[in-house]
C-alpha cells in the first residue's frame, strides 16, 4: 500500500490527494491562459477567475458530498473539514465553478460561452489527473474481482482492499477524460468546423457518458431515491448539451474564433 502522505514538513503533511489536485490545477491554468488570447481574453482574466473559483469550487464540492452523506457527517461533525481524506464530489465543484464563472463574466463583461469553451479541455485534463488522488486514498473503486493481471503491479497492489482486488474505476475515468482531452485538442485545431459552445458541449456529453457508465461500477456512490446521484447529473448534462448544440448551430455568425 502506498502511503497517502507525500511528505511532511514539521507538523504539516501534504497528501498525494492534494498533490494530484494541485498538479491538475496548474496544468489547467497554463492551458487556459494560453488559449485565452485566441478567444479575445487575457491570461489575467483566467488567473483572476481561478483565484476566486478554485477555493469556492472545493468548498462546493465538499458541501455537495457532505449533503448526500449527512447521515454520517451529522454524527461526525469534525470530519466535515477533513477533505484530505477524500470526499469531494466533482459535480459539486463543477456546479459551483459554473455559477462563479457566470457571475465573474457578468462583472468583467466577458462572454461566458467563450470562457466555458476555454475551460472545458483544461477541466477535463485536471479531472484526469485529479482522479489519481482517489488511487492514493484507495477510494472511488468498484466491486471485488479475482484478479487484475492486465494492470501494472503498483496499481494491482493499491487496489487490493479489504482482502480483495477492486475494479479501478478511478483509472477508467482518468483514461476516459484523457482521451476526451486529446480529442478536444485535436478538434480545436480545425476551428472552421466549430461554433461557439461546441467544445463545452462536447465536454458535457463526453464526460457525462463516461461517468454514467463508470459510476454504475462503483460501490461508494452517493444515492438519491435508489439511483446514483452522479448518473442523474450525467443524463441531465448530456440532454442540456445536445439541446445547446442544436440551438447554437441554427444561429449564424458565431464562429469559434472571432476575427
From Swiss-Prot:
Residues of the signal peptide: none
Keyword terms, alphabetized: Cell membrane, Membrane, Transferase, Transmembrane, Transmembrane helix
Pathway: Protein modification; lipoprotein biosynthesis (diacylglyceryl transfer)
Compartments where located: Cell membrane
Keyword Transmembrane helix: yes
GO biological process, alphabetically ordered: lipoprotein biosynthetic process
Topology in the lipid bilayer: Multi-pass membrane protein
Family: Belongs to the Lgt family.
Name this protein carries in UniProt: Phosphatidylglycerol--prolipoprotein diacylglyceryl transferase
Gene from which this protein is expressed: lgt
Amino acid at each position: 500500500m502506498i502511503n497517502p502522505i507525500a511528505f511532511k514538513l514539521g507538523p504539516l503533511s501534504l497528501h498525494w490527494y492534494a498533490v494530484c489536485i494541485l498538479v491538475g490545477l496548474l496544468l489547467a491554468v497554463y492551458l487556459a491562459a494560453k488559449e485565452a488570447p485566441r478567444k479575445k481574453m487575457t491570461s489575467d482574466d483566467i488567473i483572476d477567475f481561478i483565484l476566486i473559483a478554485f477555493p469556492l469550487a472545493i468548498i462546493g464540492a465538499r458541501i455537495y458530498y457532505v449533503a448526500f452523506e449527512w447521515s454520517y457527517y451529522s454524527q461526525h461533525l469534525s470530519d466535515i473539514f477533513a477533505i484530505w481524506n477524500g470526499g469531494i464530489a466533482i459535480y459539486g465543484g463543477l456546479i459551483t465553478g459554473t455559477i462563479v464563472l457566470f457571475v465573474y463574466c457578468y462583472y468583467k463583461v466577458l462572454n461566458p460561452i467563450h470562457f466555458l469553451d476555454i475551460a472545458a479541455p483544461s477541466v477535463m485534463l485536471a479531472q484526469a489527473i485529479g482522479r489519481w488522488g482517489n488511487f492514493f486514498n484507495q477510494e472511488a473503486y468498484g466491486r471485488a474481482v479475482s484478479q487484475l493481471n492486465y494492470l501494472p503491479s503498483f496499481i494491482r497492489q493499491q487496489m487490493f482492499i479489504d482482502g480483495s482486488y477492486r475494479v479501478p474505476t478511478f483509472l477508467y475515468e482518468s483514461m476516459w477524460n484523457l482521451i476526451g482531452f486529446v480529442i478536444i485538442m485535436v478538434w480545436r485545431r480545425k476551428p472552421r468546423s466549430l461554433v461557439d459552445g461546441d467544445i463545452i458541449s462536447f465536454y458535457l456529453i463526453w464526460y457525462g457518458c463516461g461517468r454514467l457508465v463508470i459510476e454504475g461500477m462503483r460501490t461508494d456512490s452517493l444515492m438519491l431515491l435508489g439511483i446514483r446521484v452522479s448518473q442523474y447529473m450525467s443524463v441531465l448534462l448530456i440532454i442540456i448539451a445536445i439541446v445547446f448544440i442544436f440551438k447554437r448551430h441554427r444561429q449564424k455568425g458565431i464562429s469559434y474564433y472571432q476575427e
